[in-house]
Amino acid sequence: GHTFVSYVSSIQAQLVQLDSLIRRDFVQHEFSLSVASSGYYFLSRICAELFERYRSIGIRIEQFEDHENNVADLVDSQAAEIGIVRVWSCYKNAYLKQLRARKLQHFDIASLSIAVTVGEQNPLYHRESDFVSAAELRELPPVMYSNMDSGPYADIYDRLHLSNKGSRFVVSSRSALYEILSNTSCYYLNSAYPFDVLDTGLPSNYANYRTLKLANCDITSEIIWFKREDYIMSQLSNEVINSVTRYFA
């Protein structure tokens, strides 16, 4: 009996996998888009606008959110058509080398100043200047994604002279990160995105946060996108990239 159950379970697993492949093949023939990123406000807004534009004729948009290395995995495995990530300039060459090794073709989008985002509970929120020094930040706790707490990018705080051996808050989602910013004195190491561009005439999702540029910083925040070398861009993927490029223009 145990042998029979094991045999049937194996067959069932194969049938489920086959069904998944069939459905995936069907989805590829729909008006669809799959995009992976590290979780960006501008990308969610752009995809939402795209969805509203085409929803009357039927559209499927799938957004993946993960850290930089896993975004590359998603594109390489064809789970996502395109990937959009931020890479600190000090790590960029090594990251691009990894992309090339996986036959992923990259394109530069923008080079931004490094900044920090704070909520109303942070003493920096009410300052007059739009800049903050590393020395000031060393007195405050950071909130960060788990891949910034350990791993190949964890020394960015040392490189920026922000090392704080005290408390820190580690999260795995964007929603949790901004909840922490709202309720603590933590700061988030960010990029100087042009937040106001997408918020013109619309309620701002960032009205209760403030982003300050890091003074005297020679490291930059590089925004890039990539795809598989053999992937032919679809109408929707082209529209997304064109919109992202215009956002940073």
Question: Where would I find each of the regions flagged by the language model?
Answer:
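Immediate post-signal peptide segment of exported/extracytoplasmic ligand-binding proteins
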Residues: 19, 23-33, 136-139
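Alpha-helical "hinge/linker" immediately C-terminal to small N-terminal DNA-binding modules
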Residues: 1-24
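Central regulatory/effector-binding core of bacterial HTH transcription factors
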Residues: 30-95
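Alpha-to-beta junction loops
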Residues: 75-88, 114, 181-191
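Beta-alpha-beta core module
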Residues: 99-107, 112, 175-232
